[in-house]
Amino acid sequence: MQVNSILERFLIKGAGKHLYRFSNADNKTWLMPTHNMQVAMNLYQPSGRNGKIMKALFPWLHHLLIIRKIIHAESVYCDITDELKRLFCQLFHETEIEFSIFCGTPCIHQKITMQISKGKHILGYCKVTDNKEIALLFRNEANILKELGRKGLKEVPICMFCGEMTDG
């Protein structure tokens, strides 16, 4: 899977929201908005000491150039496509949403995960792929979650949409 080619299908570059793109030593990449970054950083789950320090401090210090240089954060502007924005707004009953992106663990089953939020509240998550095998895994996961919910298990995530987008 080419993560950049998938991102190009649902991100509009050069316009929209101000985000920072950064990667860790394992070549995992994130796109985090400058607005409500503390909420967005919930998508960033570091295990190492340096990553945990960055998660705690970057939302407060991202405006300092020296900090961005230390972590090799690139300033980018982008927004999601209108089709995807409409879908999220409809699913979450909101007129505006915010997003952050994890580009996945580099592996054969790499997928993109988006965190959808509004203000200080996380609304949900979205997984994205262009790989048919991974899409089948998504469908199986959605079916399992639905079955667990039917069996009465509490706190089971609800899959609100599992399908293809026409924009790619």
Kindly give the residue locations of the regions a language model identified.
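A short catalytic or substrate-binding loop motif that flags glycine-/basic-rich loops and adjacent residues
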Residues: 104-110, 153
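Conserved beta-strand elements flanking the ATP-binding pocket of the protein kinase catalytic core
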Residues: 101-103, 114, 157-163
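Generic, low-specificity signal for short hydrophobic/alpha-helical stretches with a mild N-terminal bias
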Residues: 95-98, 126-127, 141
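A conserved alpha-helical element in kinase catalytic cores
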Residues: 79-89, 128-167
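Juxta-kinase regulatory segment immediately upstream of eukaryotic protein kinase catalytic domains
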Residues: 2-102
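ATP-binding glycine-rich loop module of kinase domains
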Residues: 110-139
